[in-house]
UniProtKB/Swiss-Prot annotation:
Region spans: Disordered: 392-454, 468-533
Name recorded for this polypeptide: Lariat debranching enzyme B
Cofactor field: Fe(2+); Zn(2+); Mn(2+)
Bound cofactor: record note: Binds 2 divalent metal cations per subunit.
Family: Belongs to the lariat debranching enzyme family.
Ranges of biased composition (kind: Basic and acidic residues): 483-498
GO molecular function: metal ion binding; RNA lariat debranching enzyme activity
Compositionally biased spans, kind Acidic residues: 427-440
CDD domains, per database record: MPP_Dbr1_N
Protein species of origin: Xenopus laevis
Gene name linked to the record: dbr1-b
Principal location listed in the UniProt entry: nucleus
Comp. bias (Polar residues): 412-423
Cited Pfam families: DBR1 (PF05011), Metallophos (PF00149)
Length: 533
């Protein structure tokens, strides 16, 4: 089965589908599935754009709204995970995944699905240690910090994925697993991105949480994006069982959707031709969700996952046969994912733009139905319910505390200040950008003009690199575990302090001179050559 893999989408759906159609004609082949590795930007309207962690001057409506409204339909079944530039308010409606538009499926905070027998898993967001052990507490309206922490990976998702035991064919993450660069051509990578050198040498580039999952899940393929460069690697896993054939993972990271950039690759994946062409739930994953339904935290308080350390009565939440039977019964013996997309808010109208539109809290009926069938908790609805209850309590307390010497103004109830989620890896923004945007009126860029697909797309196979380029996975594991352990204590060591890692450049990536920021909007598609590489 031909599967198209896309790096950072950045809302450029029209261009991505046009490129796939061009390649199908050129190679006389048929692509059956598109996988997007984050920064999808499912922006429906002006309110959604204000929920993306990008400054006003870089906001572009792009083309997703056409697929949301039904003006267009995705020509290929599309599955995506979230990155660090998303309309977080919309994705927050679907914590367990769901359709964001007809034929376009979001995998949720983490998820596993099946298509024609191919098992596909994924985790959304990027790793930041100061938010890793918190719950999903973010709510509308987002603050300066929560608009970023909303897309940070949480330990609960990693814990759930580590309960999986059945083989995985494909896994998606936005940021790279830490240490994966040791299993590929590091010299070539650093030639393209020299400013990664220090982090590669220190083994701090990438996500330790993703690295932990890579060592546990050991999928046949792992696809990522985020760093805006194509990079292939081959990792041979170790086995502790005598006689067991060790597994191997082919890793591929891809660039962002720009002309003359390697942002898309077609791969051949074995599939079961007898299986349905409908997207299906994964039974083991649903069983894990059901088993972990009581592990719930919607506060910024840190918490630790159950371990076999004498402190927890249960630490193994892997899928049991009994739970699997319950799930099958709950779903009426049908694992097909229902095509139950529905619009939950108004769509952008280019003829009548609403610059002052503000995003509001919405409970998505897809999530309501999914949770009702499996007996799960809708995190998004729970946050809304808690806010209403807290509001009622606050009103009662205010009525009872007349004459109190305490000044309520001294006690902030804004939880956003509890998470200073400064992200040095982000593409466009930091404090300077936010200050520059103050007082600016929101302006919406029109969708980019027609685009001619790049004819130089490389369709070569994923490279299998020689063993001499590999390093011991023990070294990688030690580094990963160190940072995951540090994330537990980071709250008391100065939560939210920005790291000293170098900023990820947008252009002038050879490292010469100062950092230059270039907009990834229509001007690039009109007359730009390669982006200073």
């Amino acid at each position: 089965m031909k599967i198209a893999v896309e790096g950072c989408c950045h809302g450029e759906l029209d261009k991505i589908y046009e490129t796939i159609q061009f390649l199908e004609k050129k190679e006389n082949t048929k692509v059956e599935l598109l996988l997007c590795c984050g920064d999808f930007q499912a922006v429906r309207n002006e309110g959604d754009m204000k929920c993306m962690a990008v400054p006003v001057k870089y906001r572009q409506m792009q083309t997703f709204y056409k697929y949301y409204s039904g003006e267009k339909k995705a020509p290929i079944l599309t599955i995506f995970i979230g990155g660090n530039h998303e309309a977080s308010n919309y994705l927050q409606e679907l914590p367990y995944g769901g359709w964001v538009a007809p034929n376009i499926y979001y995998m949720g905070y983490a998820g596993v699905v099946k298509y024609r027998g191919v098992r596909i898993g994924g985790i959304s967001g990027i790793f930041k240690s100061h938010d890793y052990r918190k719950g999903h507490f973010e709510r509308l309206p987002y603050g300066k910090d929560t608009v970023r922490s909303a897309y940070h990976v949480r330990s609960i998702e990693v814990f759930k994925l580590k309960q999986l035991k059945e083989p995985m064919d494909i896994f998606l993450s936005h940021d790279w697993p830490r240490s994966i660069y040791h299993y590929g051509n590091k010299k070539q990578l650093l030639k393209k991105k020299d400013f990664f050198r220090q982090e590669v040498e220190d083994n701090t580039l990438g996500s330790p949480a993703a690295s932990e999952l890579l060592l546990h899940i050991q999928p046949s393929y792992w696809f990522s994006a985020h760093l805006h460069v194509k990079f292939a690697a081959f990792m041979q896993h170790q086995t502790n069982v005598d006689g067991e054939i060790p597994k191997a993972t082919k890793f591929l990271a891809l660039d962002k959707c720009l002309p003359r950039r390697e942002f898309l690759q077609i791969v051949d994946v074995e599939h079961d031709s007898a299986k349905s062409e409908c997207l299906e739930y994964d039974l083991e994953w649903l069983s894990v969700l059901k088993a972990t339904k009581d592990l719930l935290n919607i506060t910024p308080n840190t918490w630790n996952m159950p371990e076999n350390n004498g402190l927890h009565s249960r630490w193994d939440f892997s899928a049991s046969e009994e739970t699997k039977r319950e799930v099958v019964s709950d779903l009426g013996h049908d694992l097909k994912i229902p095509c139950n997309f529905s619009m939950t808010t108004a769509c952008y109208d280019p003829n009548n733009p609403q610059y002052k539109r503000v995003a509001t809290h919405i409970v998505n009926p897809q999530t309501t139905e999914f949770c009702a069938r499996l007996g799960l908790v809708d995190l998004n609805a729970k946050i809304c319910q808690n806010e209403e209850e807290n509001f009622d309590i606050a009103e009662d307390n205010e009525a009872d505390s007349i004459g109190s010497a305490e000044d309520p103004g001294e006690y902030s109830t804004d939880t956003s200040v509890l998470s200073t989620s400064v992200n040095p890896d982000e593409i466009t923004l930091e404090d300077d950008d936010d200050q520059e945007d103050e007082g600016m009126e929101d302006k919406l860029g029109e969708p980019s003009p027609e685009y001619t697909p790049d004819l130089s797309i490389n369709l070569s196979k994923i490279r299998v690199l020689p063993d001499s380029m590999a390093v011991s996975s023990d070294d990688a594991t030690d580094s990963t575990n160190d940072e995951l352990d540090r994330s537990e204590s980071s709250q008391t060591e100065g939560e939210g302090k920005p790291s000293n890692r170098p900023l990820k450049r947008i252009s002038d990536e050879n490292g010469s001179g100062g950092v230059k920021i270039k907009r990834r909007n229509q001007a690039i598609y009109q007359a730009k050559d390669d982006e200073d590489e």
